[in-house]
């Protein structure tokens, strides 16, 4: 997942830490949401421009890397609005995984040693950032099933079972 940030940093010459700071988060301003929506147009801003290290340009460099990766080989890209960036590629399979909040909270508690309240806050914060980021760059709702080829509730699945189900779906979908 972080590999895309490193590759975008290499391609742009922008410090990888800046990509990390903007990773699926938007900087807030009072006019956020009013002035801009869906600024992704596929290009990148040159270094001499004052917006070279803007969030939008950081996103555009990541999008450029995502497109290059998809052109070179089969790959799995998690998040980063890749479904939207690659929307015109007929070979892209867009997957969405979800689970009830109580299951997500339990998982975050176990993985991070957090209390229930801390886990809930973390999930709410991250989901809010991701939803805003996705809406800003795509103009779409992150949780809208129409944006994906396959949506799956992973509640009662082990990782092994999830891999099996997804692999089977991909084989059927590609026929």
List each language-model region with its residue ranges.
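Short, amphipathic alpha-helical "lid/cap" segments that border enzyme active or binding sites
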Residues: 63, 159-167
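RNA pseudouridine synthases
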Residues: 69-72, 81-88
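Short, charged, intrinsically disordered terminal tails
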Residues: 168-175
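Conserved phosphate-donor/acceptor-positioning beta-strand/loop module used by diverse small-molecule
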Residues: 88-110, 116-124
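A short beta-strand-loop structural module common to alpha/beta enzyme folds
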Residues: 1-5
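ATP-dependent small-molecule kinase phosphotransfer cores
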Residues: 7-74
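Small-molecule kinase domains that catalyze NTP-dependent phosphoryl transfer to phosphate-bearing small molecules
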Residues: 24-37, 115-159
């Amino acid at each position: 997942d972080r590999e895309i940030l490193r590759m975008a940093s290499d391609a742009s010459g922008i410090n990888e830490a800046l990509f990390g700071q903007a990773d699926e988060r938007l900087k807030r301003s009072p006019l956020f949401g009013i002035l801009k929506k869906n600024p992704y147009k596929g290009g990148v801003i040159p270094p001499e421009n004052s917006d070279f290290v803007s969030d939008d340009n950081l996103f555009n460099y990541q999008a450029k890397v995502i497109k290059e990766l998809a052109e070179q080989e089969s790959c799995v890209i998690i998040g980063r609005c890749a479904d939207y960036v690659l929307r015109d590629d007929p070979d892209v399979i867009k997957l969405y995984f979800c689970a009830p909040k109580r299951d997500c909270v339990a998982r975050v508690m176990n993985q991070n040693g957090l209390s229930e309240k801390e886990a809930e806050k973390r999930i709410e914060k991250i989901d809010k950032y991701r939803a805003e980021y996705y809406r800003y760059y795509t103009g779409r709702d992150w949780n809208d099933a129409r944006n994906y080829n396959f949506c799956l509730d992973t509640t009662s699945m082990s990782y092994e079972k999830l891999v099996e189900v997804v692999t089977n779906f991909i084989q059927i979908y590609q026929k």
